[in-house]
């Protein structure tokens, strides 16, 4: 298998990610390495993050234990 095949397969696997996020019954979000929210589902917006909240302000406003928890459970 060549490198291109591996990349293409990875893209195909990832192509359904937005639908999975939106259909999840539990809170889900996707953030960049810098901490910026780039996607989330309505459950996350309702239970955890106010829709109109600035991501950086929101993240800095949660307690340090929760920030650490978010960092440890992030998926690369």
UniProtKB/Swiss-Prot annotation:
Keywords: Activator, Conjugation, Cytoplasm, DNA-binding, Plasmid, Transcription, Transcription regulation. It comes from the Bacteria. Coiled coil: none annotated. The keyword Transcription applies. It is found in: Cytoplasm. The keyword Nucleus does not apply. One of its GO terms (cellular component) is cytoplasm. This protein is essential for positively regulating the expression of transfer genes that are involved in the conjugal transfer of DNA between bacterial cells. This is Protein TraJ. It comes from Escherichia coli. The lineage of its organism: Bacteria, Pseudomonadati, Pseudomonadota, Gammaproteobacteria, Enterobacterales. The gene is traJ.
